[in-house]
Amino acid sequence: MRLKLLWVGKTQESWVRTGIEEYAGRIRRYLPLEILEAREEKGAQAAAMRERECERLAKLIPKGGRLVLLDERGEAMTSPELASFLSKNRDQGTQDLVFAIGGAYGFTDQFRSQAFKSISLSRMTLTHQMVRVFLLEQIYRGFTIINCEPYHHE
């Protein structure tokens, strides 16, 4: 299985980039990981921005990729539940598991309809920059759970 992370806009803060690099490196010990950025839309109405950003994200999804949205409306999961989700996808032969983080105005309904699953990291509002690090850390944590490594504590 290959993992792809898609998000809108460049990572602005150096400390966020450092966190991304740290956890991306750890994840790559378990499987291939690719991070792709879709250009952020500026200067338009919210609906138009959302539409254009989702079009750009859609172009980055490989054919047959299983799309998972990070969305405030998504299903809340525990870390062990995410680990189970990752493990099942790997064991069932998913070639590309694609996690997408939307822009400031989220996803269009059409883009949401393409998703295999939608998950939420928190009921609180998180910045789109910080979600990148949180998602990577949770994916890494998931693989340590799968491999019975001493990182996650219950």
From Swiss-Prot:
Compartments it resides in: Cytoplasm
EC number of the protein: 2.1.1.177
SUPFAM superfamilies: alpha/beta knot (SSF75217)
Stored InterPro entries: Alpha/beta_knot_MTases (IPR029028), RlmH-like (IPR003742), tRNA_m1G_MTases_N (IPR029026)
Catalyzed reactions: pseudouridine(1915) in 23S rRNA + S-adenosyl-L-methionine = N(3)-methylpseudouridine(1915) in 23S rRNA + S-adenosyl-L-homocysteine + H(+)
Gene Ontology molecular function: rRNA (pseudouridine-N3-)-methyltransferase activity
Keywords: Cytoplasm, Methyltransferase, rRNA processing, S-adenosyl-L-methionine, Transferase
Coiled-coil zones: none
CDD domains named among the record's database cross-references: RlmH-like (cd18081)
Primary site of residence: cytoplasm
Lineage: superkingdom: Bacteria
Amino acids binding S-adenosyl-L-methionine: L70, G102, L121, S122, R123, M124, T125, L126
Pfam families: SPOUT_MTase
Keyword Cell membrane: no
Any one Gene Ontology cellular component term annotated for this protein: cytoplasm
Subunit and partners: Homodimer.
Function: Specifically methylates the pseudouridine at position 1915 (m3Psi1915) in 23S rRNA.
Family of the protein in this entry: Belongs to the RNA methyltransferase RlmH family.
HAMAP family given in the database record: 23SrRNA_methyltr_H
Listed name of the protein: Ribosomal RNA large subunit methyltransferase H
